[in-house]
Design a protein with these regions (language model features):
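Long, low-complexity, charge-biased intrinsically disordered regions
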Residues: 1-331
Length: 331
């Protein structure tokens, strides 16, 4: 099979299986040209860094323009679903205005098309090598005297016998406080990898309004843990062997320390459910949670409106580099 539901399937020069929505994006750009009688202007980021489209006060679009706007958003949403997670935050933000979009919102959506036209070589490569985390410290805490006791993972009893090579899950998580300045809602951004292959991505406004970064990052960590548990059981039911623990990385050290230390306290009862959900997963050994610098966190791609220079060094090895990603870092 070489094409299915908008995805091209092929192998690159080193025989790595690749998935890329190139034909689908080409068709999107053709429809764009038919609609607006011009090609989109090339840009290197979906939306300008730090932009707040919710503050736009330009004129509302008429009915025909609104229908075009909704059609463009729908096309972009499918592009996200089939691999272009680099535009997901922008599409998520602009989807909020589908009911009553403005001229400024349409200009921003056109910019996303310009980004896709410029950065049209994005490809998900199925890299099956297990990532090496041997340099990470292995914390040794006794959780048995905590409120979680000797908690263990709930493993389904009706899953088939696992066969094949083992899979290691990696999760990158981030939150953007007050992403929407009108509602005060933060955005959760999560990127999931099986071995070295991106398999799922998430960018969505949080249900609650958090007043501090600590709270929004803990909500994001809790959502990531829920996803991790779901992925583990999905792979079990597919008969795929998985490692005992998943690796989760976040850039908020306070949240990481509060989650991984048994004697850590909580001063905000508002965060208590997220706090205990994450800590229980760590106490059971399902999750290993580590801190990384914010500039090295790929989840930034999914949590905020970013600039090219800010993100390229983490986006490039994920979507725009063929071969060994270590060579990409060396460059």
């Amino acid at each position: 099979i070489s094409y299915h539901l908008g995805m091209d399937f092929f192998r690159d020069e080193d025989k790595t299986l690749c998935m890329a929505p190139k034909k689908y994006i080409d068709k999107m750009l053709q429809n764009y040209e038919r609609t607006f009688k011009s090609k989109p202007q090339f840009v290197t980021s979906p939306i300008e860094k730090g932009d707040n489209p919710e503050l736009d006060t330009s004129e509302l679009l008429d009915d025909d323009q609104t229908q075009n706007y909704q059609s463009l958003i729908g096309a972009l949403q499918w592009a996200v679903s089939i691999g272009r997670f680099d535009i997901q935050t922008a599409v998520m933000s602009m989807s909020s205005f589908r009911a009553a979009p403005r001229i400024g919102h349409l200009k921003r959506v056109k910019r996303i098309f310009g980004y896709l036209a410029k950065m049209n070589e994005a490809t998900i490569r199925v890299r099956t090598e297990i990532p090496d985390y041997s340099d990470l410290p292995e914390p040794h805490y006794d959780w048995s005297r905590s409120v979680y006791g000797n908690v263990t993972e709930d493993i389904p009893l009706d899953a088939p016998k696992p066969l094949g090579k083992v899979v290691r899950f990696t999760h990158f998580v981030d939150a953007n406080l007050m992403h929407d300045v009108l509602t005060g809602k933060s955005v959760t951004g999560i990127l999931h990898l099986a071995n070295q292959t991106p398999i799922d991505w998430y960018s969505k406004k949080q249900a609650t309004v958090e007043t501090a970064t600590y709270g929004s990052e803990f909500v994001a960590a809790r959502i990531c843990v829920d996803h991790a548990v779901d992925l583990r059981n999905t792979f079990r039911y597919l008969g795929v062997p998985i490692e005992d623990s998943n690796y989760m990385f976040g850039d908020n050290k306070s949240v990481v320390d509060s989650s991984t230390t048994p004697h850590a306290g909580l001063n905000k009862r508002h965060n208590i459910l997220s706090f205990h959900r994450v800590r229980q997963a760590i106490a059971s050994g399902v999750i290993k949670f580590y801190h990384i610098p914010g500039e090295e966190n790929p989840a930034d791609i999914l949590s905020k409106h970013w600039g090219y220079s800010q993100i390229w060094h983490v986006l490039r090895p994920l979507l725009f580099w063929g071969g060994d990603t270590a060579d990409c870092i060396d460059e």
